[in-house]
Design a protein with these regions (language model features):
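Conserved class I S-adenosyl-L-methionine
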Residues: 1-41, 141-163
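A short beta-strand submotif of the Rossmann-like class I SAM-dependent methyltransferase core
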Residues: 110-114
Length: 239
């Protein structure tokens, strides 16, 4: 579970909710496009770890995918099932889902989760757990904010200065290095590939979001794939 969010922060005072929503929907479309193009699986069993209120059904739609939503807060998992956004709910924390048997999923999804986990401890247990839970040929899918993007770098500076709550409302938004995450996935026995989801930022005016977002089509290009504001890691267990 992430830390308590403080709505009275600098960035939210300056941001228009409609602007935030526009980029959120644009980002979801881009996530869906990337996963459809690169996952290489048409359906199966999927686990959304740290599902929160949005377990990622837009990425893993019915009827092709059976989606299990797991969260340390059981109410969030129940909410996902009640809304039809998941087929089953499970209480449990990332890296501690020992109740689930080995090789029981084709996809393990961490959507905007690992950068919160990184605040509390190392990511290696989550990656090792993903490999254990995956069937041969299955994939860990992680979508995270990027330390190498200017916004991520600025956020990291604010966090180091102890200003995270004042600036963006929570201390546990920890932008991740895509290179380090890919290396950690490889060390866990997975085969990683990486794509930039979007170069844009939800706090920008909508017109600027569109202009910067035009670069997203280059998000799988060598070199540029490392520099998105958010990135997608697809890390496969060998078949």
């Amino acid at each position: 579970m992430s830390e308590i969010y403080t709505p009275e922060n600098l960035l939210d005072r300056l941001s228009d909710p409609a602007t935030l929503a526009a980029q959120y929907e644009r980002g979801k479309r881009r996530e869906r496009e990337l996963l459809h193009r690169h996952l290489g699986l048409a359906g199966g069993d999927a686990l959304s770890v740290g599902c929160g209120w949005h377990p990622g059904r837009h990425l893993l739609p019915r009827p092709a995918w059976r989606l299990v939503a797991a969260d340390i807060d059981p109410e969030r998992a129940r909410h996902a099932v009640a809304r039809g956004e998941a087929d089953e709910g499970l209480q449990g924390a990332a890296g501690r889902l020992d109740v689930l048997p080995d090789g029981s999923f084709d996809v393990v999804l961490h959507r905007l989760v690992l950068h919160h986990v990184a605040y509390a401890g190392p990511l290696e247990p989550c990656l090792a757990e993903a490999r254990r839970l995956l069937r041969p040929g299955g994939a860990l899918v992680a979508i995270e904010p990027n330390l190498l993007h200017p916004v991520g770098a600025a956020l990291a500076v604010a966090n180091r200065a102890g200003l995270g709550v004042r600036v963006h409302g929570t201390p546990d938004d920890i932008p991740l290095s895509p290179r380090r995450l890919a290396a950690a996935a490889r060390a866990a026995g997975l085969e990683p590939e990486l794509h930039a989801v979007t170069y844009s930022w939800r706090r920008l005016p909508v017109g600027a979001q569109r202009a910067v977002g035009a670069l997203d089509r280059f998000g799988s290009a060598p070199g540029l794939r490392w520099l998105g504001h958010t990135f997608m890691l697809i890390a496969r267990r060998a078949g």
